[in-house]
From Swiss-Prot:
This is DNA utilization protein HofO. The keyword Cell division does not apply. Pfam families: HofO. It is a single-pass membrane protein. It comes from the Bacteria.
């Protein structure tokens, strides 16, 4: 410890002044950075509070929005006997079933619409020509309700 003091007092006054100025500059810099750090932290806290309020407002909007469950029609293969479509066969299964229709080209898209209204999905389908008619075969799946 005495060596440090001996060195300090042995240096020129100009070098000691430069050391004092350097250490004073370092101290001022640390104080300045510390204050900006506090300002950034306070701004971050305000930002988090603002985000929390916005999320709370969004949750209130979601909770107040009316939830309307769409009513689905019950599925019946006889619903597909319309003009331009004739039911050929229906083979029910636990997962859904297979529906075969003799139909016109124009009736094919409406069959998918009617299935969607009844909450029935199509896993596979095929279209084949039999004479003058179109054989439309659908592999259907009903959703599992639990």
């Amino acid at each position: 410890m005495n060596m440090f003091f001996d060195w300090w007092f042995a240096t020129s006054p100009r070098l000691r002044q430069l050391c004092w100025a350097f250490w004073l500059l370092m101290l001022v810099t640390l104080i300045f950075l510390s204050s900006t750090h506090h300002e950034e932290r306070d701004a971050l806290i305000r930002l988090r509070a603002s985000h929390h309020q916005q999320w709370a407002a969004l949750y209130r909007l979601v909770d107040t929005a009316p939830f309307s469950e769409e009513k689905t029609l019950p599925f019946s293969p006889l619903d597909f006997q319309l003009s331009g479509a004739q039911l050929v066969s229906w083979h029910p299964s636990a997962q859904g079933g297979e529906l075969a229709l003799k139909t016109l080209w124009e009736a094919v898209p409406s069959a998918f619409t009617r299935l969607a209204e009844r909450n029935v999905s199509v896993s596979r389908f095929s279209l084949s020509v039999e004479g003058d008619d179109l054989l439309f075969t659908l592999q259907l799946e009903t959703p599992h309700e639990g």
